[in-house]
């Protein structure tokens, strides 16, 4: 008699095909094309209406954004296609615990506006490396971070979002992967290069609306298919692949699938790690990452920046319902594909022997939605991908131009800075295209967990340096640099070990070293943060005290101090001006950049005749916001946000709203704990 527990025989290939000959209907294609045209029109509209011929106008949207586009851009910059694919995939695989990242981010984005942003505004900084330059002096720390920021985003967030978007585009449209990605990058780079941050923020606002509409529609279809939340809870634990081995635990739903807080030793996300290990990388992302902070600095004043953070915080409640729960529904509806447990079968289903949970969201879209709505959700995924790409392109360009290039060429003219910023965006596009083969080879069973583990190895040291610099006046350059380098080295060692000793599949023994196998990445984040903090504290305590100029208006406790009238550290950023105690600007901080621009302009027009230009050159200069007839030296340089003053009534309303938002988050933590 044959054993009933033998290895399962794969069913016919057509039953295993995750996307069985699904193709977009003409109506879907029309919706997608209309979306592309609409986004491009909005991007070009913002390009025409905004001031792009200055460094501040291009990199900080002129500093006149109101709260709602700032909030929408914060949310869209955070929630890329990796969220849709990754959160839904992790929900299908392990349940709702992954939503802890979103609820944790809710607190962090509020801390940005209420705690960290006032320090940045008081210090008159436009980039995060610039803050560290003014806070600690020297060039070691800002140059180190200015080098890390673009590479970190390009090789992690950019990589994941491109792969996630490629899953959707390639399988639904049956396009060549390179063709799909190159097309997206081309459109994205066009309005990023042309319009700067203003174009990015306006298109982010549009894409946030599209993402939310599409995601709400799919959530409704998903819950209707399983009978609501009660049906989801009843059926999720029965969602098993029919071809799994009966004597194997692989592919079984977790018993704690509907709980966020899980066992501290044996679970996939231990609760101490969620509370503490997750918080430090979250603070890095929301409070010190250039992509996020740059959007808040583009607000017209502190109240609008707070309003934007509040809007983003409320929206951070939604991913649990819009992405995680639909991913769990997908496992119920398509268990043989989404919940496949045998490596050979998974390889045939999605070309990934580790598991196919990451196809959960695309599977719902392509199988559940009717014609037309399917095209809308394609637009949603494209919107999510393009939002992330524009955020990375613009912010990486800002850091390279304002911190690295300006350090190399301190007398660079404003025109040169504008050209360098745009060329760097094009260079990132080229790197992104060349990175596609690596994206294809790096797909894992849970995409979202992949990026979070990498973040836990690289971000805590940077976050600790910012925290110590903002809240302990005794922190000096030697302590911060020592802690930063030690932390980054330890994180790189763990990262390399993770790549060398790959996590085995469910049906394989785990022979990895104990430091990799037994130390969860969130626990390692706690260890790394503690080590960095102790190093910064110890070295700073036993070395010289920072000068007053490196502390005044650059910490939480000194943000209201009057500006030093002499012996102050000269700002190296061409946007900086001195701000008086009452918030008015003074002319003492004008950068050498203006002198260079004025000198060049005077020389070019000394004979009273403007040089002739070809029509092609004129078009290119207009696209980049650098028309020849606009080469006039500005009469003054406007600061980003010049005052910490707020209207008392508005401040009270914002504070009350902040308390309400935090209360909602605490309720959700408790309800799903």
UniProtKB/Swiss-Prot annotation:
Subcellular location per the Swiss-Prot or TrEMBL entry: Membrane; Apical cell membrane
Topological region Extracellular: 1-27, 78, 124-180, 230-272, 330-375, 440-446, 501-521
Recorded catalytic activity of this chain's protein: myo-inositol(out) + 2 Na(+)(out) = myo-inositol(in) + 2 Na(+)(in); 1D-chiro-inositol(out) + 2 Na(+)(out) = 1D-chiro-inositol(in) + 2 Na(+)(in); D-glucose(out) + 2 Na(+)(out) = D-glucose(in) + 2 Na(+)(in); D-xylose(out) + 2 Na(+)(out) = D-xylose(in) + 2 Na(+)(in)
Expression sites by tissue: Expressed in kidney and small intestine.
Lineage: Eukaryota, Metazoa, Chordata, Craniata, Vertebrata
Recorded superkingdom: Eukaryota
Gene3D superfamilies: Sodium/glucose cotransporter
Pfam families xrefs: SSF (PF00474)
Coiled coil, from the record: none
Protein name (Swiss-Prot/TrEMBL): Sodium/myo-inositol cotransporter 2
Membrane topology: Multi-pass membrane protein
Keywords: Apoptosis, Cell membrane, Ion transport, Membrane, Sodium, Sodium transport, Sugar transport, Symport, Transmembrane, Transmembrane helix, Transport
GO cellular component, one term: plasma membrane
BP GO terms, sorted: apoptotic process; myo-inositol transport
Purpose of the protein: Involved in the sodium-dependent cotransport of myo-inositol (MI) with a Na(+):MI stoichiometry of 2:1. Exclusively responsible for apical MI transport and absorption in intestine. Can also transport D-chiro-inositol (DCI) but not L-fucose. Exhibits stereospecific cotransport of both D-glucose and D-xylose. May induce apoptosis through the TNF-alpha, PDCD1 pathway. May play a role in the regulation of MI concentration in serum, involving reabsorption in at least the proximal tubule of the kidney.
PANTHER family referenced in this protein's UniProt entry, alphabetically: SODIUM_MYO-INOSITOL COTRANSPORTER 2 (PTHR11819:SF171), SOLUTE CARRIER FAMILY 5 (PTHR11819)
Chief location bin: membrane
Family: Belongs to the sodium:solute symporter (SSF) (TC 2.A.21) family.
InterPro entries for the chain: Na/Glc_symporter_sf, Na/solute_symporter
């Amino acid at each position: 008699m044959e054993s009933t527990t033998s290895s399962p025989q794969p069913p016919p290939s057509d039953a295993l095909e995750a996307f069985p000959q699904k193709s977009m209907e003409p109506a879907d294609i029309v919706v997608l094309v209309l979306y592309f045209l609409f986004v491009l029109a909005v991007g070009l509209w913002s390009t025409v209406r905004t001031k792009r011929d200055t460094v501040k106008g291009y990199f900080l949207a002129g500093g006149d954004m109101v709260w709602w586009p700032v909030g929408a851009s914060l949310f869209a910059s955070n929630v890329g296609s990796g969220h849709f694919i990754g959160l839904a995939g992790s929900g299908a695989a392990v349940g709702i615990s992954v939503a802890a990242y979103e609820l944790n981010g809710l607190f962090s984005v509020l801390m940005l506006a209420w705690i960290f942003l006032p320090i940045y505004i008081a210090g008159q900084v436009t980039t995060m490396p610039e803050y560290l330059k003014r806070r600690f002096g020297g060039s070691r720390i800002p140059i180190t971070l200015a080098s890390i920021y673009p590479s970190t985003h390009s090789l992690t967030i950019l990589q994941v979002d491109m792969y996630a978007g490629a899953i959707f585009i390639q399988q639904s449209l049956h396009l060549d992967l390179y063709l799909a990605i190159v097309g997206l990058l081309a459109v994205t780079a066009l309005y990023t290069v042309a319009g700067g941050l203003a174009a990015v923020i306006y298109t982010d606002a549009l894409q946030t609306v599209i993402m939310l509409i599409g995601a709400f529609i799919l959530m409704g279809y998903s819950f209707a298919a399983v009978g609501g939340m009660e049906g989801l809870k009843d059926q999720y634990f029965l969602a098993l692949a029919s071809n799994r081995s009966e004597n194997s635990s692989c592919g079984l739903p977790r018993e704690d699938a509907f709980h966020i807080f899980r066992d501290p030793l044996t679970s996939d996300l231990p609760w101490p790690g969620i509370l503490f290990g997750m918080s430090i990388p979250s603070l890095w992302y929301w409070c010190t990452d250039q992509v996020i902070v740059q959007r808040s600095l583009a607000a017209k004043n502190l109240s609008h920046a707070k309003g934007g953070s509040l809007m983003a915080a409320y929206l951070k409640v939604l991913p649990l319902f819009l992405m995680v729960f639909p991913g769990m529904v997908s496992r119920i509806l398509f268990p043989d594909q989404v919940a496949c447990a045998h490596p050979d079968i998974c390889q045939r289903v999605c070309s990934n022997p580790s598991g196919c949970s990451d196809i959960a969201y695309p599977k719902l879209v392509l199988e559940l939605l009717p014609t037309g709505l399917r095209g809308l959700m394609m637009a949603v995924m494209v919107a999510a991908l393009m939002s992330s790409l524009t955020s990375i392109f613009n912010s990486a360009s800002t850091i390279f131009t304002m911190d690295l290039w300006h350090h190399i060429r301190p007398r660079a003219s404003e025109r040169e800075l504008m050209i360098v910023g745009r060329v760097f965006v094009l260079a990132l596009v080229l790197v992104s295209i060349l990175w596609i083969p690596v994206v294809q080879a790096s797909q894992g069973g849970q995409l979202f967990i992949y990026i979070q583990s990498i973040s836990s190895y690289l971000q805590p040291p940077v976050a600790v340096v910012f925290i110590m610099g903002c809240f302990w006046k005794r922190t000096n350059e030697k302590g911060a640099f020592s802690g930063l380098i030690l932390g980054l080295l330890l994180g790189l060692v763990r990262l390399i070990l993770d790549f060398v000793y790959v996590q085995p599949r469910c049906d394989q023994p785990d022979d990895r070293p104990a430091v990799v196998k037994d130390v969860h990445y969130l626990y390692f984040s706690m260890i790394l943060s503690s080590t960095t903090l102790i190093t910064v504290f110890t070295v700073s305590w036993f070395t010289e005290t920072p000068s007053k100029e490196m502390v005044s208006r650059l910490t939480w406790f000194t943000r209201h101090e009057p500006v030093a009238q002499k012996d102050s550290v000269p700002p190296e950023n061409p946007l900086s001006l001195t701000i008086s105690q009452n918030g008015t600007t003074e002319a003492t901080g004008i950068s050498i950049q203006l002198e260079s621009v004025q000198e060049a302009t005077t020389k070019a027009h000394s004979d009273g005749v403007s040089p002739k230009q070809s029509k092609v050159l004129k078009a290119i200069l207009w696209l980049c916001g650098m028309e020849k007839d606009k080469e006039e030296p500005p009469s003054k340089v406007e600061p980003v946000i010049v005052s910490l003053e707020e209207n008392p009534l508005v401040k009270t309303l914002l504070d009350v709203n902040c308390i309400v938002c935090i209360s909602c988050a605490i309720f959700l933590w408790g309800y799903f704990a």
